Amino acid sequence: MAQAFPASTFTGSDYHEGSVTEAAKRASEAGVADRASFEVAGAQSFSGTGHALVTSFDCLHDMGDPLGAARHVRSTLAADGTWLIVEPIAGDTIESNLNPVGRAYYAFSTFLCTPSSLSQDVGLALGAQAGEKRIHDVVTAAGFTRFRRIGETAFNAVYEARP
């Protein structure tokens, strides 16, 4: 993104220090370190305010407190800002997820996503097959007034949330 939008600045956040170190190294190698910085921070503590765009990729369903994270995102966005949310594609019912991708995601979720969430504070445990309705409910409970699916692949749904 820093290469595609050279007039913008970017801050990447992750709670895993090794990932942050690697991201900073790659930004330097790509020649964008002057406009891309990285910090060790969780979804409820990343820095900044007035963001035009906040992104989250395949992580909301793994969080122990996705509502707390959504509230923090909301508090850091500009009044006309956008939260871009990428999550595993899922229907809202078990029956709608009984397909090859859904079955694989249920398996991953059983061994990774759900235990990860349960090990954290709150432990909501949305899991990889949360579905659009559950994501919508979290986002709107956090104070967002607009939520819509703006894209999808065979594996992911892409949502836009706005204040």
Predicted regions and their residues:
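A short glycine-rich, Lys/Arg-flanked "PGG" loop and its adjoining helix->strand segment in the class I
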Residues: 67-79
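Core SAM-dependent methyltransferase catalytic element
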Residues: 142-163
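Conserved SAM-binding strand-loop segment of SAM-dependent methyltransferases
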Residues: 30-43
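Conserved SAM-binding motif I beta-strand of class I
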Residues: 9-14
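A short SAM/SAH-binding and catalytic strip from SAM-dependent methyltransferases
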Residues: 52-67
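C-terminal alpha-helical "lid/dimerization" subdomain adjacent to the S-adenosyl-L-methionine
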Residues: 86-142
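A short acidic, Gly/Pro-enriched loop at the edge of an enzyme's catalytic core
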Residues: 41-54
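Conserved SAM/SAH-binding beta-strand->alpha-helix loop
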Residues: 16-18
